[in-house]
């Protein structure tokens, strides 16, 4: 081999690591939900078309993700370039200037295609701070086969009382079949998302118009008594450890007759590759009780860029790709139209999608009905259905969630949990200077 060839080969070998080092690393923090895991898997398509961007994934359990992101963004730590957040964080962090505005999006992104309730929930004073990956309401899942065998009929929108009665009829713990599955895992976005909407349906509210907590009221007592007694009697063992993913696994394995949770689960419970009850699952609106105001939540997992990111352009490129119509088509082509991330775009709800996704009509109608500005039967000073959009809510909701989880395990009574929630919330609100 002559010297000139050797020199060329040596130069080429040296260039390879330099090319690899030249790629900009984009660190993405996300939640370990199925749709996000699919996004991570399909992100190879993005990397192929963006060889100058190398993706680094940090995938965390929901409560852990929220804690990590809150700490990082409040301290401007800069650990992450792209965050998976919800409407609560988008509103508060956007207002504080902690997030980059999602402006200057390409025309083919079709911003006007986003559902108004979702776009508004991720905006502050008309400025969009996060791009919605999927959006959800809460709906009722139930086993059509079990209802038919028992001679029961699920209403289009049941009451919680009716669900309790159905759960009693369908509870067969000796056969590994439980009447109802509900979130019990403590967390402001876990058990309190479910309990918050249940309480709304019973006519309760977090605060009165003077920002005084209302856990001492009769509506909260009825709501929590129902939740605890129903889940203790007719729920699965260890319900206090179950969040969205745990209950999804239980329902898919045929262990839950009824499940009230996020509409995004629709594509998973009807997927025969992961659900034993895909053909036997029915869908209804989230239960009401004395009202349907605030009976169904509104939530979106969305992608946002922290102001501390050192890779803002790369982050916007990926966020735009992952929330685009083109990404939806990619999912439809590779994994089936029913698996397209739901709830964010009007164009998703084509006739083909509606035909392939039996949960789609209930989901879309629920998303049209929700109103975070008027979330409860009685007037309130806050915005938010299953949450209260104030900075203090994350700590308050987490603490109340722990107390209600303790009531579920029998460590304290419902009355004791409510009294403790009233005291701790009043103390936190006073410390924060409410009413403001």
UniProtKB/Swiss-Prot annotation:
InterPro entries per the UniProt record, alphabetical:
Bact_solute-bd_prot1, SBP
Would you name any one GO CC term? periplasmic space
Localization annotation: Periplasm
Do the record's keywords include Signal?
A: yes
Record keywords: Periplasm, Signal, Transport
Q: What is its main location?
A: periplasm
Q: Name one Pfam family in it.
A: SBP_bac_1
Q: Which domain of life is it from?
A: Bacteria
So which residues are the signal peptide here? 1-22
State the family named in the UniProt similarity comment for this chain.
Answer: Belongs to the bacterial solute-binding protein 1 family.
Described function: Binds mannitol with high affinity.
Record protein name field? Mannitol-binding protein
């Amino acid at each position: 081999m002559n010297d000139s060839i050797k020199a060329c080969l040596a130069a080429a070998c040296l260039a390879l690591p330099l090319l690899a080092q030249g790629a900009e690393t984009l660190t993405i923090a996300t939640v370990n939900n199925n749709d996000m895991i699919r996004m991570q898997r399909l992100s190879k398509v993005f990397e192929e078309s963006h060889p100058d961007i190398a993706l680094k994934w940090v995938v965390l359990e929901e409560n852990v993700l929220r804690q990590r992101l809150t700490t990082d963004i409040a301290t401007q730590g800069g650990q992450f370039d792209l965050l998976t957040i919800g409407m609560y964080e988008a509103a508060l962090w956007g207002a504080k200037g902690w997030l980059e505005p999602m402006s200057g999006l390409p025309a083919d992104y079709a911003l006007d295609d986003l559902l108004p309730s979702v776009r508004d929930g991720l905006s502050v004073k008309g400025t969009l701070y996060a791009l919605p990956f999927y959006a959800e309401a809460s709906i009722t899942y139930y086993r059509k086969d079990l209802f038919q065998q028992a001679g029961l009929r699920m209403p289009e929108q049941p009451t919680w009382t009716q669900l309790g009665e159905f759960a009693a009829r369908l509870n067969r713990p000796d056969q590994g079949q439980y009447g109802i599955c509900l979130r019990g895992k403590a967390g402001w976005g876990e058990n309190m998302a479910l309990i918050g909407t249940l309480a709304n349906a019973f006519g309760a509210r977090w605060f009165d118009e003077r920002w005084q907590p209302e856990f001492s009221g009769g509506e909260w007592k009825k709501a929590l008594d129902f939740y605890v007694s129903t889940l203790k009697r007719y729920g699965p063992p260890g319900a206090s450890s179950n969040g969205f993913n745990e209950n999804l696994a239980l329902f898919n394995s045929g262990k839950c007759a009824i499940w009230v949770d996020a509409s995004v689960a629709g594509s998973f419970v009807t997927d025969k590759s992961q659900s034993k009850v895909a053909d036997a699952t029915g869908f209804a609106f989230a239960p009401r009780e004395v009202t349907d105001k605030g009976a169904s939540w509104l939530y979106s997992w969305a992608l946002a860029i922290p102001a501390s990111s050192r890779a803002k352009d790369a982050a916007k490129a990926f966020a735009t790709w992952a929330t685009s119509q083109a990404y939806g088509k990619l999912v439809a082509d590779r994994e089936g139209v029913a698996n397209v991330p739901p709830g964010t775009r009007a164009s998703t709800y084509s006739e083909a999608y509606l035909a392939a996704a039996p949960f789609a009509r209930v989901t879309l109608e629920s998303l049209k009905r929700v109103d975070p500005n008027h979330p409860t039967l009685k007037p309130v000073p806050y915005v938010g259905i299953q949450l209260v959009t104030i900075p203090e809510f994350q700590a308050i909701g987490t603490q109340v969630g722990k107390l209600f989880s303790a009531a579920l395990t029998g460590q304290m009574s419902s009355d004791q949990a409510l009294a403790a929630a009233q005291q701790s919330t009043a103390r936190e609100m006073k410390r924060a200077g409410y009413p403001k």
